[in-house]
């Protein structure tokens, strides 16, 4: 989660989800892609 929030993996969807707020639901997908 730290890498996703502050790391900035270059995922535009991550930034948008975080701003909208829907980061919780997209967080799972982002985390899965980050590890993969």
From Swiss-Prot:
InterPro entries noted in UniProt: NAD(P)-bd_dom_sf
Superkingdom, taxonomy of origin: Archaea
Transmembrane segments: none
pH-dependent activity: Optimum pH is 5.5 for F420 reduction with NADPH, and 9.2 for NADP(+) reduction with F420H(2).
EC number: 1.5.1.40
Keywords: NADP, Oxidoreductase
Gene3D superfamilies, per the entry: NAD(P)-binding Rossmann-like Domain
Binding site for NADP(+): 9-12
Broad class of enzyme this protein falls into: oxidoreductase
SUPFAM superfamilies noted in UniProt: NAD(P)-binding Rossmann-fold domains (SSF51735)
Reactions catalysed according to its record: reduced coenzyme F420-(gamma-L-Glu)(n) + NADP(+) = oxidized coenzyme F420-(gamma-L-Glu)(n) + NADPH + 2 H(+)
Thermal behaviour (record text): Optimum temperature is 34 degrees Celsius.
MF term (GO), any: 8-hydroxy-5-deazaflavin:NADPH oxidoreductase activity
Family: Belongs to the F420-dependent NADP reductase family.
Biological role stated in the UniProt entry: Catalyzes the reduction of NADP(+) with F420H(2) via hydride transfer, and the reverse reaction, i.e. the reduction of F420 with NADPH. In M.organophilum, an alcohol-fermenting methanogen containing an NADP-dependent alcohol dehydrogenase, is probably involved in the regeneration of F420H(2) required for CO(2) reduction to methane. Thus, during growth on alcohol and CO(2), the F420-dependent NADP reductase probably has the function of coupling the NADP-dependent oxidation of the alcohol to the aldehyde with the F420-dependent reduction of CO(2) to methane.
Quaternary structure, from the entry: Homotetramer.
Protein name: F420-dependent NADP reductase
Species for this entry: Methanogenium organophilum
Lineage: Archaea, Methanobacteriati, Methanobacteriota, Stenosarchaea group, Methanomicrobia
